[in-house]
């Protein structure tokens, strides 16, 4: 029975139908207001794996597949910027085994994304690694910098991979840069304003954050993009784990966003 249901799900006629439905939904949503900057807090990989009695690594791997699927749909819709909270600085407090495992997944994921030419090249994605890069293992850092270098000339869309990241670190880094500029005489205290502060953030030259989505039912931002959230940012807390986040759950959120942002 399991083999039969698996065949049915992956059979060509059904897959063709799903592809047609996806195209129809994308074309419909594109007629309305599409958020230009979407951020994801990808929470619940470990709990998703435990719920299914799987290894933790399987949860994180499935989470990466969900990100790829959603990223592709975002690009098809014309979203210009996607920010993904892939690893918090706080995650270094986990066991060495899990940290090493997450680093390996991140390295492999970045390699896959940059090697996946039909995604990166077709949609002109520029990858930015945003976070405290000094904490990365040498081989992971090398892969991250390579992804940035390979895609630096792309201008159609931006993927901010927040890894390892917290807003507190980002804000502290901006303050340190401004203090150094003042000490060097590059700026005076009177020059310091919001624009100077934003120009020294790790996530700089970004579009306003339109939509922030967090999975797993937890209703907090967990130190993610606190400066970038503004009065018009819509924040959605959804009650399922990240690996279960399919495009079919994403489409209704975008339609709801459009209904809530109709011209007066």
Curated annotation (Swiss-Prot):
Keywords: Endoplasmic reticulum, Magnesium, Membrane, Transferase. GO terms for molecular function: ditrans,polycis-polyprenyl diphosphate synthase [(2E,6E)-farnesyl diphosphate specific] activity. Pathway: Protein modification; protein glycosylation. GO terms for biological process: dolichol biosynthetic process; protein glycosylation. It is found in: Endoplasmic reticulum membrane. PROSITE patterns: UPP_SYNTHASE. This is Dehydrodolichyl diphosphate synthase complex subunit SPAC4D7.04c. It comes from Schizosaccharomyces pombe (strain 972 / ATCC 24843). The lineage of its organism: Eukaryota, Fungi, Dikarya, Ascomycota, Taphrinomycotina.
